[in-house]
Amino acid sequence: MYDALAQAEHDSDAVSIVVSSSKQLLDNLYSCTNAHDSGVELIKNQQIQFVLSEDKGQAIKLINDYSPEHLLVTDTKIDIQLFTNYGSLFIGENSAVAFGDYCAGPNHTLPTNGAGKFSGGLSVHQFYKVLSTQKINDNGRNILAKTSAILAQAEGLIYHQKSATVRQ
């Protein structure tokens, strides 16, 4: 419970979502949260939300669709490969999210607002420059010219089309 509350307290735009297929667990967490003034405020502002899933599969789909910055999974036996979109994954009760915030070791510059769907946390890879280069041979030119001309025409881009057709 404190992990969800800790993330919700970052700022007024922060949202923590607790997902479980156990209504009893969610009810207990809601009651515990509601017992504190700050918890009441977080619930009122929808900064902490309790979501009941039909089963583990639905919970995993919801999590991957949401792509949280921090994902705490208490089930240590779950196949973590099922989780595909998150900033940082914390596995088991011992893995407090606050440890990752402060001192566990991995970089804490993480994707927010669902950006975990296409990006991971800051790493050395963000400092690489990827350059694209094309060198087309005569055979490739003929094939690509036809395809490019068709696509350019469909988009209504006349000069793209001409750029391709002069190479046929």
Enumerate the predicted regions with their spans.
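A broad, low-specificity signal for short, low-complexity segments enriched in glycine/proline
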Residues: 11-12, 33, 51-53, 87-91, ...
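Glycine-rich, Lys/Arg-enriched anion-binding loops that position phosphate/diphosphate groups
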Residues: 36-75
